[in-house]
């Protein structure tokens, strides 16, 4: 399996039915071992942060063992809209 920001973005978008996904490879030489993600999904509605992160972790269960560092931000569509206005 070859990890890339594009691969992770598409998997998160499909599996979490996300309306917006940003994935940044934060590895020094872009060698795909560290990522920062932002996922906006209605599936996060009514769920606390820990449950949201679990959904993301479950989605990427096969990929996470190959990732050295993983930072995630999970928002509902309403939170995303509000945050962009600020």
From Swiss-Prot:
Its main location: cytoplasm. It is found in: Cytoplasm; Nucleus. Keywords: Acetylation, Cytoplasm, Nucleus. GO terms for biological process: [2Fe-2S] cluster assembly; intracellular iron ion homeostasis; protein maturation. Coiled coil: none annotated. Pfam families: BolA. One of its GO terms (cellular component) is nucleus. InterPro entries: BOL2, BolA, BolA-like_sf. SUPFAM superfamilies: BolA-like. One of its GO terms (molecular function) is 2 iron, 2 sulfur cluster binding. The modification N-acetylmethionine is found at residue 1. Interacts with GLRX3; forms a heterotrimeric complex composed by two BOLA2 molecules and one GLRX3 molecule; linked by [2Fe-2S] clusters. Belongs to the BolA/IbaG family. Acts as a cytosolic iron-sulfur (Fe-S) cluster assembly factor that facilitates [2Fe-2S] cluster insertion into a subset of cytosolic proteins. Acts together with the monothiol glutaredoxin GLRX3. This is BolA-like protein 2. The gene is Bola2.
């Amino acid at each position: 399996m070859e990890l890339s920001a594009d691969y992770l973005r598409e998997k998160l978008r499909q599996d979490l039915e996300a309306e917006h996904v940003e994935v940044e490879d934060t590895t020094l030489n872009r060698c795909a071992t560290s990522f920062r993600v932002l996922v906006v999904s209605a599936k996060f509605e009514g769920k606390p942060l820990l449950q949201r992160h679990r959904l993301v972790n479950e989605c990427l269960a096969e990929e996470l063992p190959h990732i050295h560092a993983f930072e995630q931000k999970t928002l509902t569509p309403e939170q995303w809209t509000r945050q962009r206005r600020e």
